Amino acid sequence: MEKIKYGFGEIEAAASDIQSTSGRINSLLEDLKAHIRPMAAAWEGESAQAYNEAQQQWDSSAAELNTILSTISNTVRQGNDRMSEVNRMAAASWS
């Protein structure tokens, strides 16, 4: 029979890593924008409008991704906390 094994520290580290991934993505996107900005500043008319619309969609998608990553991180952390509490209650039942 296999045992259930729960690594509380590892799960907390995974939740933190998921959350920090959001920051890394934002940093990379800002770097990309900084590289594009000089070129985009020269665009006019339809080119500028098309870029701005695409950039708004990109920003919206990035914000949505950040929300999803935050939700996943929080859910993992909450599950870990709940399992830790169940573990404490089980241990206390033997006292």
UniProtKB/Swiss-Prot annotation:
Oligomeric state and partners?
Answer: Forms a tight 1:1 complex with EsxB.
User: Per the UniProt entry, what species is this protein from, by scientific name?
Assistant: Corynebacterium diphtheriae (strain ATCC 700971 / NCTC 13129 / Biotype gravis)
Q: Which Pfam families does its entry note?
A: WXG100
Additional facts recorded = To improve expression in E.coli the proteins were cloned as a single protein in the order esxB-esxA with a cleavable thrombin tag.
* Cited InterPro entries: ESAT-6-like_sf, T7SS_ESAT-6-like
N-terminal signal peptide: none
Give the family, as the similarity comment puts it: Belongs to the WXG100 family. ESAT-6 subfamily.
Name residues in a coiled coil: none
- Domain of life, per UniProt, equals Bacteria
Protein name per the record: ESAT-6-like protein EsxA
